Amino acid sequence: GGYTHAEVMAAMQGYGDAGRLRYAWISPTLDTLFPLIYASFYVGILYRFAPMTRLQGLVYIPILGGVIDLAENAQIVAMLLQYPDISVAQVEWANRFTLTKFIFTRLSMLMAVIVLAFAALQAIHIRWQKRQS
């Protein structure tokens, strides 16, 4: 999965000089906000709704995902600025960061859904018990 050196080189060429510079400028600004926002969102959900205190340690998964996303963005900016001198190894490292980021973001999303579902079921159960008494 992911992308190859040939695909990166073709994309970089397709962007053109102006496109690469624009992308290199946008990535550190806008692409920095997104990981911070989604990591904070998932951390907040996991911290607030984790059913047991020991499960609140799950907050480190979205934090790590956000850090990996930022590292991936740095790799992309480096490739944008170094074009056409992009090594196969650099693309492989960027690809690893991309694939790892996807794993951590999907895992964070799944954990948030599970924790929210558990919290909702718990709230329904508590209300049902109150009606029974």
Q: Where are the regions that the model predicts?
A:
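Extracytosolic (periplasmic/ER-lumenal) interhelical loops and adjacent juxtamembrane/interface segments
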Residues: 1-23
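Membrane-helix exit/interface motif
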Residues: 11-19, 37-50, 75-82
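Interfacial segments of alpha-helical transmembrane regions
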Residues: 47-67
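Hydrophobic alpha-helical transmembrane segments
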Residues: 26-47, 113
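Cytosolic juxtamembrane helix at the C-terminal end of the final transmembrane segment
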Residues: 116-133
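Membrane-interfacial loop-to-transmembrane-helix junctions in polytopic alpha-helical membrane proteins
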Residues: 16-26, 50-57, 86-100
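Transmembrane alpha-helix/helix-exit interface in multi-pass inner-membrane proteins
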Residues: 1-3, 32-35, 70-75
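Alpha-helical transmembrane segments of multi-pass integral membrane proteins
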Residues: 65-120
